[in-house]
Amino acid sequence: MAGMKEIRGKIKSVQNTRKITKAMEMVAASKMRRAQERMRAARPYADKVRDIAAHMSRANPEYRHPFMVSNEGAKTAGIILVTTDKGLCGGMNTNVLRASLQKFKELEGQGKTIEATAIGTKGLGFLNRLRAKVVSNVVHLGDTPHLEKLIGAVKVQLDLYSEGKVSAVYLAYTRFVNTMKQEPVIEQLLPLSADQFERKEEDGTTPSTQWDYIYEPDAQAVVDELLVRYVEALVYQAVAENMASEQSARMVAMKAASDNAKTVINELQLVYNKSRQAAITKELSEIVGGAAAV
């Protein structure tokens, strides 16, 4: 009977755990939908800024913003690493950190040192364990990222590039593909290339940008401001995609945990039933044996 009592305790414990994981799955599903909406809402802004910047760059070919000038001679590279603040999201952080580590080794193989910006506590902890140079960080963004919280940390990397101190700035994050699939991505953020300004419509055509603007105070000042806003929008978009990926990965992980808990409960219930059956059979045998002796 002591064994049966222990099994009942295990069943109760797993049932309580399943209630928690089921609740977390439902919360993650709700947060995932909101994160996807924010991710989709951020895209039109970045697209419009890109269209205007492309138009102005073509209209003023003699001017090249520092973000579009190569700093190949610099011996340092910058990287903005976007991860989550919390765990329980499967292998999402592990995958992007593994890809980042490979990029670090690649850059170090080229004789470059790394100056990193961490967005998220998991990435910050990873960089600290590597003893990497962290020039800025932002953590505890919550479930709703705000651009103003990111600007300060991102600006450090933009200033390093503008001053020619880093050869390139890379952006590492987890791209949202669909609910069941998220993939680690490392993109070159700076220098900007002409290809980044060639946006394609869904039918594969290039959108028309034949506009006539009057610039105040002048086109150069507007381009300077626009390109900074464009790069900030790219980072915000990456953070929004990372958060959508986080909630999707957490929902899938909690569903797997709930399903596994159900399997464990069924197995324990089977063991309990067998133990109970054996105990009843033993008692009946003792009763029958006692009656026969009388």
Curated annotation (Swiss-Prot):
Keywords: ATP synthesis, Cell inner membrane, Cell membrane, CF(1), Hydrogen ion transport, Ion transport, Membrane, Transport. It is found in: Cell inner membrane. Pfam families: ATP-synt. The keyword Chloroplast does not apply. GO terms for cellular component: plasma membrane; proton-transporting ATP synthase complex. CDD domains: F1-ATPase_gamma (cd12151). It is a peripheral membrane protein. GO terms for molecular function: ATP binding; proton-transporting ATP synthase activity, rotational mechanism. One of its GO terms (biological process) is proton motive force-driven plasma membrane ATP synthesis. InterPro entries: ATP_synth_F1_ATPase_gsu, ATP_synth_F1_gsu, ATP_synth_F1_gsu_CS. Gene3D superfamilies: 3.40.1380.10, ATP synthase, gamma subunit, helix hairpin domain. Belongs to the ATPase gamma chain family. F-type ATPases have 2 components, CF(1) - the catalytic core - and CF(0) - the membrane proton channel. CF(1) has five subunits: alpha(3), beta(3), gamma(1), delta(1), epsilon(1). CF(0) has three main subunits: a, b and c. Produces ATP from ADP in the presence of a proton gradient across the membrane. The gamma chain is believed to be important in regulating ATPase activity and the flow of protons through the CF(0) complex. PANTHER family: ATP SYNTHASE GAMMA CHAIN, ATP SYNTHASE SUBUNIT GAMMA, MITOCHONDRIAL. This is ATP synthase gamma chain. It comes from Paraburkholderia xenovorans (strain LB400). The lineage of its organism: Bacteria, Pseudomonadati, Pseudomonadota, Betaproteobacteria, Burkholderiales.
